[in-house]
Amino acid sequence: LESIDEKPLRFLRYFIMANYDTSKEKDGILREDQIYSWLSNNNDQCQYEEKPFQFVEKMKHDVNLYVKYRKAQGDDAGNMHLKNVTMLAGNSYKLHLMLMLAASEMDEEALSKFKEVVESVVYYTVINRITTNITERTFASWCSEIRRITSAESLDAFVARAVIPTVTSWKQDNQSNFMR
């Protein structure tokens, strides 16, 4: 995390929301000041007491993914789309990394396609001026479904069921956004 100048608490928030059920939190969003109490109260999900090494290995694996997705080096496997996220939303934008961490079970084809979906969603959040709290709430709600996606076919079904209707609702107010 130090190599990308990232705050550990931000990673922990995204790690937890990407990998575990946070639906009991307000809007499904775990705040930084709630992380330690959430962990203390959710061993049943994390199983850090029963399987501490597996929990740490999962966290270590996701740190490496987080850094990899943040740097998005090379043009292979859809990394161009992750690079474009930074160009669209700015260097400080990192909300999409929560989605990328949730996508860790996807096969290579699905993951490459998912990076393109993420780029498109970020484009629509920027162009439609969707607030950060709405974007974060939306992304957090998608994580539980994204965790179960393994193939391009199941990704297509998720996009049709969840992403397209959400983006369409954001586009409803396009004319007024362009006139501002």
Predicted feature locations:
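A cross-family structural signal marking well-folded subdomains
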Residues: 1-180
